[in-house]
Amino acid sequence: MAVVTLSEMMEAGAHFGHQTRRWNPKMQRYIHCARNGVHIIDLVQTAVCMNNAYKWVRSAARSGKRFLFVGTKKQAAEVVALEASRCGASYVNQRWLGGMLTNWSTMRARIERLKDLERMESSGAIAMRPKKEASVLRRELDRLQKYLGGLKNMRRLPDVVVLIDQKREYNAVLECQKLDIPVVSMLDTNCDPDLCDVPIPCNDDAVRSVQLIIGRLADAINEGRHGSNDQGDEG
């Protein structure tokens, strides 16, 4: 049985690529045709790639691999947070900060600072500080929660990164390459399939397309860990 059906992908608009002038020729094998100046992705190829990606991710989850979801564009941010949380993965959905992976020791210290501030806030310790100092601490807390909140349970580097919009998250791709972390990536027609390990050719701009693909990958993680699609927890 297919992980995603052609009708599901059509309804989600997963077949719409970018304008033909913006394409990457390396994506040619995944393109069905051009229509009104826009490339149309071959959804038969997408279905095959999605089946392969589902099996790959499920196997990785079954063997205990840890996942990081990355998608910072507006139409992906909410989906990334919801689906990563549902399968117990970590996530970045606001902005990729340079060195998030390659300078992990520093990033880990910032995450610990976030946890300390959260404990101070919940215990009332911040409220007991002078008004100006409390305001500074709360601004720091808000900033850390915004950018690092999805990484609070990530105790070490991820084993797999799931990526939306390769062009936008290019710095994340480079850090993964440097650290030999495999990347599962949605690939629109302007992307480079050589920069990922597990390609999924599809529209990475439409919310419904992102929801469909990322939701199925979250299902694969839960199935690999628990034999079902119920919520998981990486711990």
Curated annotation (Swiss-Prot):
Disulphide bridges: none
Alphabetical list of Gene3D superfamilies matching this protein: Glucose-6-phosphate isomerase like protein, domain 1 (3.40.50.10490), Helix hairpin bin (1.10.287.610)
Annotated InterPro entries: Ribosomal_uS2 (IPR001865), Ribosomal_uS2_bac/mit/plastid (IPR005706), Ribosomal_uS2_CS (IPR018130), Ribosomal_uS2_flav_dom_sf (IPR023591)
Organism: Synechococcus sp. (strain RCC307)
HAMAP family reported for this sequence: Ribosomal_uS2_B
SUPFAM superfamilies (UniProt xref): Ribosomal protein S2 (SSF52313)
The protein, known as: Small ribosomal subunit protein uS2
Keyword presence, Transport: no
PROSITE patterns assigned to the protein according to its UniProt record, in alphabetical order: RIBOSOMAL_S2_1
One biological process term in Gene Ontology: translation
Keyword Ribonucleoprotein annotated: yes
Any GO molecular function: structural constituent of ribosome
Keyword annotations: Ribonucleoprotein, Ribosomal protein
Superkingdom per UniProt: Bacteria
Family designation: Belongs to the universal ribosomal protein uS2 family.
GO cellular component: cytosolic small ribosomal subunit
